[in-house]
């Protein structure tokens, strides 16, 4: 037993002596040096990449205002977002994929422009609509039921889910609903502009008025609220008056709305950026002055706005309500301006006011008061 221990001791001593040879020491030092160099190299590479990314981000940040100024049409595309044709691959010529008892047709508001429209029947007409053609559907606009012309916001088409869901609710409540894709949107030809969108909606409104024997009112959402008040004011200037106007998530004017955009807010601290933004909008002839329009608009107005709207702040809807109310009082009129605020706790945000269970009651009550005037 002791002999084994002695032999193990001699082996350990030999190993220890071997470990301490100059060649092995040099090898270990070389390995440690290589590891440190590798670690230092990794740190240097990480710092270099971080600097490059930071430089790229700074370049992009600085170049955005310059590029938009040099190419002002870019801002127009950002505002209209008409090239984002959600839902992709939707066949707008077959509305039955999205809505029951809905016909698709096109109108030509001016030469070279064709706009797509869906006409959704009130639920009460569905049974009679079985097997009927487009002419019969058009004739139903004269059945005495109210007609809503829905003017949607930017991006997407009339087939976008929150738009379709609103149409379903309004149809169930007994309204004819006509959903328009402005020029450049969906299956409509042409390029969007404020003047063009207004022309398209005005043409549809006048076309419907020729068919209908009941109230015809405009329902604008987001970008569409500017189109709505433009149309209503244009009609008023021609000696007529839109029966009623519903503004869902409206903005005061496009300049103010653009200032509130998250991208714009990143630049607001830069001197001169705000005036540059307004100048570019002016170059694009994009104003959509809801505030100015409501100062003179005589049509009844209902404003719907959610407190938690993360696109257009609720205070803009409140400001428009105050403007319209003051204008109404100046005309010694009553009952023509109403506003409904949806609490933030409901979570409707910008696109989901249609989910409110009292929506049709609110709209129906408003229209009933309009009829009594």
Tell what function each PLM region has.
Residues 42, 110-207:
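Membrane-embedded segments
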Residues 230-299, 351-355:
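Hydrolase active-site cap/lid region
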Residues 2, 54-108, 113-134:
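An N-terminal hydrophobic leader/cap segment in hydrolases
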